[in-house]
Amino acid sequence: MSECMVCDRIELTKAGKNPYFVRELETGYVVIGDYQRFYGYTVFICKQHASELFQLENDFKMKYLEEMSLVAECVYKAFPCDKIHYELLGVGSGVHMHWHIFPRREGDSPVKGPVWKVPKEEMYSEKYKPTTEQLEEMKEILGKELDKVFN
């Protein structure tokens, strides 16, 4: 285990041991979020260990942003929603750049605003952890949309 939990996830993915992995792209990895409080929640992890966009070489940065936008479009089509929320956060052992892509639907949370207004105990409740079957179905649905754009 490294000091970066995101790098650890990348290593799991490379070893074929990340059940949430959907697709490798030129600049990053598409993975289904561990918890699905917002159905279709997806993460796009940067292949380069950097915490800020300005730390990336310009051509890579522009390609990463383009791919993130295309992944978000695929999420939108795979998991119909009213709006996509994009968030590039990071703190502690999770500063390695990764986009949180949240499909949002009218009335999907008790308060309007970012998903982080939902209490942590609800956001990360075991009831929102997809079963193996649900996860495989989500990966297949998103994979089909990614195929249309990236193949």
Which residues fall in each region the model found?
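HIT superfamily nucleotide-processing domains
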Residues: 1-151
